[in-house]
Regions:
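Phosphopantetheine-dependent thiolation modules in NRPS/PKS and related acyl-activating systems
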Residues: 1-43, 48-81
Length: 81
């Protein structure tokens, strides 16, 4: 699982985001496209593509795209151990 792949999938799910504009340090909650519907879409994407469940608390605690990726990666590691 690579951060770059996660970012590409995240971009694909966000409305009005030009591919290649998100960076690991992007504060995703400050994006114009970010809203509660996008949060639900992200939760569904992570479940479908990575097999882990993000919670509202996870989204609240994370600040950057990289933070989100770290949570997904950690949850995936726990599932596989």
């Amino acid at each position: 699982m690579l951060l770059e792949d996660f970012i590409k999938m995240f971009e694909a799910e966000l409305a009005d985001i030009i591919p290649g504009t998100l960076l690991p340090e992007t504060v995703y909650k400050q994006l114009d496209a970010w809203n509660s519907m996008q949060a639900l879409i992200l939760i569904a994407m992570v479940d479908a593509d990575y097999g882990v469940t993000l919670t509202a608390e996870n989204l609240h605690d994370c600040v950057t795209v990289s933070d989100l990726f770290s949570v997904v990666q950690n949850k995936k590691t726990l599932l596989n151990s």
